[in-house]
Regions:
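C-terminal, non-catalytic "cap/extension" segments appended to globular domains
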Residues: 3, 20, 28, 35, ...
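Signal/transit-peptide handling
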Residues: 13-25
Length: 204
């Protein structure tokens, strides 16, 4: 009864699915040169990096903040510490010493949209859900489309788990679906690496 409005997770899924159709169509264009392919693949893989690293940092920080705020006021010094710790925890050794951005919480509007808490989470959820569904579409072809249309129709009638289960037949409560969605990024990464190797001087 509380799902009469479509959730942000499914809104992001639909928009990202459409982006993937466009990206796939562009990359299949035989007239595309290496520079154009490189630009498209760089965007796709860079987006993947943002959705799988930067946005989870935002979510984990916001979660930690809400937990501490429930106990009382959180000082600026503690906000900075929470942000730096979260960034270090997610990025690990890929983040150079002192490379944290402790004031990141102050520069992102999404943290201050009080009407939608944890606004960053739907982006990663929708990104991975759409990639998982697009992988099904590539496997099944046109036979997938009626179920995807049903998926879109059901938004606003149930939670994301129920919509995906009843329309597509996928279980979002198990790690396998999400792991498979992440694995779909391996192909564009490999294609990007091949293009870079083919043009070692950076001239494409």
């Amino acid at each position: 009864p509380f799902a009469h409005l479509y959730p942000m997770t499914l809104a992001e899924s639909a928009s990202t699915f459409a982006e993937m159709i466009l990206t796939e169509g562009q990359l299949s264009n035989p007239d595309l040169n290496d520079a154009q392919k490189l630009a498209i693949l760089d965007t796709e893989t860079s987006n993947g990096a943002v959705f799988l690293t930067d946005l989870p940092v935002r979510f984990q920080f916001e979660k930690a903040f809400h937990e501490e705020r429930a106990q009382g006021e959180v000082e600026v010094s503690r906000l900075k510490q929470l942000m730096a710790e979260t960034q270090r925890g997610l990025f690990g050794e890929t983040l150079e010493e002192g490379g944290e951005d402790p004031f990141f919480w102050a520069s992102k509007l999404h943290f201050y949209i009080t009407g939608v808490t944890f606004y960053n989470f739907p982006y990663t959820f929708g990104f991975l859900l759409s990639r998982g569904l697009f992988a099904r579409f590539k496997e099944e072809g046109a036979a997938f489309l009626p179920r995807y249309e049903d998926f879109l129709r059901r938004t606003g009638q149930d939670m994301a788990e129920g919509v995906a289960r009843d329309s597509i037949g996928v279980d979002l409560t198990t790690p396998d679906f999400w792991k498979g969605a992440i694995d779909t990024l391996l192909e564009p990464v490999a294609q990007l690496e091949e293009l870079i190797d083919r043009n070692p001087g950076g001239e494409v």
